[in-house]
Amino acid sequence: MLTKFETKSNRVKGLSFHPRRPWILASLHSGVIQMWDYRMGTLLDRFDEHDGPVRGVHFHATQPLFVSGGDDYKIKVWNYKTHRCLFTLHGHLDYIRTVQFHHEYPWIVSASDDQTIRIWNWQSRTCVAVLTGHNHYVMCASFHPKEDLVVSASLDQTVRVWDIGALRKKTVSPADDILRLTQMNTDLFGGVDAVVKYVLEGHDRGVNWASFHPTLPLIVSGADDRQVKLWRMNDTKAWEVDTLRGHMNNVSCVMFHAKQDIIVSNSEDKSIRIWDATKRTGIQTFRREHDRFWILSAHPEMNLLAAGHDSGMIVFKLERERPAFSVSGDTVFYVKDRFLRFFEFTTQKEVQLAPIRRPGSVSLNQSPKTLSYSPTENAVLICSDVDGGSYELYIVPKDSAGRADYLQDAKKGAGGSAVFVARNRFAVLEKSSNQVLVKNLKNEIVKKSPLPIATDAIYYAGTGNLLCKAEDRVTIFDLQQRLILGELQAPSVKYVVWSSDMESVALLSKHAVVIANKKLVHRCTLHETIRVKSGAWDENGVFIYTTLNHIKYCLPNGDSGIIKTLDVPIYITRVIGNNIFCLDRDGKNKLVTVDASEYIFKLALLRKRYDHVMSMIKNSQLCGQAVISYLQQKGFPEVALHFVKDEKTRFNLALESGNIQIAVASAKEIDDKDHWYRLGIEALRQGNVGIVEYAYQRTKNFERLAFLYLITGYMDKVGFMCKIAGQNNNLMGQFHNALYLGDALKRVEILENAGQLPLAYITATTHGLTEIADRLAAELGENIPSLPEGKARSLLIPPAPLTASGDWPLLRVMHGIFEGGLDATGKAELEEDDEAAGADWGDEDLDMVDASEAMANGGDGFDAEEGEANEEDGEEGGWDLEDLELPPEAETPKNAGNARSAVFVAPPPGMPVSLIWTQKSSLAGEHAAAGNFDTAMRLLSRQLGIKNFAPLKPLFVDLHMGSHSYLRALATAPIIPIAVEKGWSESASPNVRGPPALVFTFPQMEDRLKAAYKATTDGKFPEALRQFLSILHTIPLIVVDSRREVDEVKELIEIVREYVLGLRMELKRKELRDDVNRQQELAAYFTNCKLQRVHMRLVLGSAMGLCYKQKNFATAEHFARMLLENNPNEAQARRARQVQQQCSGKKDSSELNYDYRNPFVVCGATYVPIYRGQKDVSCPYCGSRFVPSIEGQLCTICELAVVGADASGLLCSPTQSR
């Protein structure tokens, strides 16, 4: 059983498939009818007008109707498009068990517990026949698919077949029937239009279900005696053929399969059983743990069944319908009707090659599952689930094409899956041992190879390679070298599709498509809500795949879309241009022609083949919101512009692409305040002053307009704005403009007119306007405000705009491939005079006038050519400015900037100093100073094997910042970085560049070393360790001038390494409080480090005292002797001699891992001695030694390099590379 869909609900008592749509009706014991889309797995609708359980439900074959019958004695006919019940049929006197539409006539047959069967005309909404004769509940009734018969089953232990031929004749030619019974008589005694033809007796208990065979004169029935009986009938009689036994409880429902010779039954024993209708034997049984089955339904066209049970229903198939096929070159090989066939794509010729052996068993799902073809040997491998998984090898002679009688003995073998891996070799998966067997064409094992992962299936992955599928991932396995060539996380892969060049692979699972390259490096993943069925690569590298109801595409970057909607699932075999070759579920080759222009267009954009894009824009009918949205998302709004006619969309795209001209044209058409506002913002961002001015004029945003005039230096226009504000009685606007102008007299006048005499007096007095101040003082009388004494006065005037000009100069850029010529109107609007305009964007030929002139003409519209009447004149008389003496008409933005701006030509860029620094340098410090951190890291990795760059990050930043100086310029200009060179002088040639001046130098390292020595002497071990490590981390980035200094740097590394090792051991020793032996060993190893003599004396004294305390007298005596050899001071010498005397001739109380007689070095990670002659590995940078097991790990001394890594060596001077 292949479950396609499952629901959880109350007990399902009735089921019905829609004949064409992927819908199923389920009627529940709770009284609800559900309509599901079983393909998408969604609940489409629910209908709940019945009172009590609904036991019968059925779709009409052609109309948007379904019928239902329930325990409320009602039959309801529904229209699922309008979601309502059309009418209710009354007549039954007890529960209604089943209802069914006639396939041709407007009839409904219903079976009821009132012991009758009724036939209704749903068009006239009347009962046309009552079939009486059963003497117990009638459990089901159904029409014959072709003849005028009805079959019914009843708890009176009989199955009855009724002849309704007379009813049909009366319906076809309704004549006045003088003997026609009244409706009451029909209800009581039944009509004469339907008579019993056969009564089938044989069941020992009540019969629950009976149904006709779709084509043969057979009936199948199931009863409470747990038996399924098969009956045959002819024109005169009917008889029992056989009895199928196996159910353990009442048989609820039974029916013939529409396309196969099988019978399907279900029962209250919680099982569904499949029977062979010809051999009358059980084939398969499917069980549920807790749910009894009540109803079955078969799809009239497709190979689908549904079963209702106590907690829902399931939609399932009995067998896979996917044909086994393999594409090779221009041919597809496939299996159909137990024959191996091939189909040529170019000639579209289908040829039958050879018959395929039928499986011996009668169980389901024995058809071929996969097929693999070897073109050189003309051999075919067919795998199936026969005998738990097996394969058959056919070698087809060249001359056998078309000979259906040709039959050969296939070479067989057991195996989960089998594929060809070479010309005459194939691989077979042996699941039990998780190994692959390589066999020749004689079916002999040539080689066995264990697989690297627990493999469920194998697929071809190139000659000699297998793609192994596990539950959660796939790997490519080289059979010859037994190596994994690639691995990818991809759960539950079902199919693998390689491109023709074997460079790309698509991994298809139930609801996902994963695209990867030939080494299984992930490219993209697509997730689908419904099942993915098949796929193939087209010649452009686009993957075309199918789901249950769509053909879709996937571009190399993961973008996808729908090409075509499907009615039935198909399996793609080949894609050639606009033609998709495929197989359907019946194994027929089909050709589907599609429009590939959408994905070809997107692919050309992705690959930047703009000539193709331009050609497609001009010649094809690409349109629609999806293409526009895609272009916008991918950063091509200028291309999307040429598809758009809607002005609002054009405006948005024009702003996004920075195309001010089209934005202005669209804003004029829309003429909406919000769009002018947005246009102003974009024009301001581009520095296009003329357009900004025009946008502010259209929105009457006079405050912004006045400020724009101020910052661009048009002070005369600020004066006009002041007059306009005065005419509008806008005191604040008037005062702001007077402030912008620095006109104190005007400000006094405005304040006086506003009645603010004290403020006017203060302003006049402050600015030295004594006459006006005296006049105002006389008016104020005693209310004269007092001015603060001793404070200096200052003139309130805005600074003069230094960069006052028209439009900002913009760098000239290359025209995009899409600019110009794509549509006639766009070309006319966008035509430019390049020579005249240069980079000054103030030259657009726009219909604009000055704000003052616009005010004079009515104030609403600023477009003089539009000639529009002022729509707001009647309401806003305060805008009337006719009496003003205004200057001549302001210039449009075309000439807005020409008075002060000239053609701007950007200077050619030179080579950055940082690039000069790194061109011929192999020194990591200089690359870091130039800001090329990635190349610096690569150099350090190659030279010193450094892998951990975290400690070097702040040093890189310090080097880069320290080798540059930064110069602030104007507020509108960016900060200018200046490279600081080593040995720079004014007399140097500008074409000769020196190396960068580095902040880290070798003398600095010597100063740090002295500080670290002092911290060590003072016993500040953590601080000393930090300082030594800072030296070790900085050394790779310093640069010295001579070979002698290079040697000194290398010597410094050795010194620091010894101290870091010793200090780490000492800090480790102090952490160990309980392990006294390990404490003594670490103290002893510290004495083996090469230290300064002053520090060596301290270390020896510490080790001597520790060993003496723990009664290791021999070792303590050794340390005392070494201390005396290192010129100790008087106190140290006295102490050493005392220990020597006490320990003379005594032995150690415990054995230490320390032999001072045998030369050794200490492992920097494990702190154990590595004696001479033992194997070790070293750090490529600091030279620390380690036991071999540490190889490949990070060095614990320098914390930078990888132990045992290959490296060329320290490079810290230009002299080393000469």
Curated annotation (Swiss-Prot):
Record key words, sorted: Cytoplasm, Cytoplasmic vesicle, ER-Golgi transport, Golgi apparatus, Membrane, Protein transport, Repeat, Transport, WD repeat
InterPro entries recorded: Beta-prop_COPA/B_2nd (IPR006692), Coatomer_alpha_WD-assoc_reg (IPR047312), Coatomer_asu (IPR016391), Coatomer_asu_C (IPR010714), Coatomer_complex_subunit (IPR050844), G-protein_beta_WD-40_rep (IPR020472), TPR_COPA_B (IPR056176), WD40/YVTN_repeat-like_dom_sf (IPR015943)
Protein source organism: Oryza sativa subsp. japonica
Bias (Acidic residues) ranges: 862-882
CDD domains with a match to the protein in the record: Coatomer_WDAD_alpha (cd22948), WD40 (cd00200)
Gene3D superfamilies named in the record: 1.25.40.470, YVTN repeat-like/Quinoprotein amine dehydrogenase (2.130.10.10)
Biological process (GO), any one: endoplasmic reticulum to Golgi vesicle-mediated transport
Protein name: Coatomer subunit alpha-1
Quaternary organization: Oligomeric complex that consists of at least the alpha, beta, beta', gamma, delta, epsilon and zeta subunits.
Residues covered by region (Disordered): 857-882
Compartments, record wording: Cytoplasm; Golgi apparatus membrane; Cytoplasmic vesicle, COPI-coated vesicle membrane
Keyword Repeat recorded: yes
Any one Gene Ontology cellular component term annotated for this protein: COPI vesicle coat
Top-level taxon of origin: Eukaryota
SUPFAM superfamilies linked: DPP6 N-terminal domain-like (SSF82171), WD40 repeat-like (SSF50978)
Record lineage: Eukaryota, Viridiplantae, Streptophyta, Embryophyta, Tracheophyta
Pfam families in the cross-refs: B-prop_COPA_B_2nd (PF04053), COPI_C (PF06957), TPR_COPA_B (PF23953), WD40 (PF00400)
Function per UniProt: The coatomer is a cytosolic protein complex that binds to dilysine motifs and reversibly associates with Golgi non-clathrin-coated vesicles, which further mediate biosynthetic protein transport from the ER, via the Golgi up to the trans Golgi network. Coatomer complex is required for budding from Golgi membranes, and is essential for the retrograde Golgi-to-ER transport of dilysine-tagged proteins.
GO molecular function: structural molecule activity
Topology relative to the membrane: Peripheral membrane protein
Residue spans of the WD repeats: 7-48, 49-88, 91-132, 133-172, 202-241, 246-285, 288-326, 363-404, 450-489
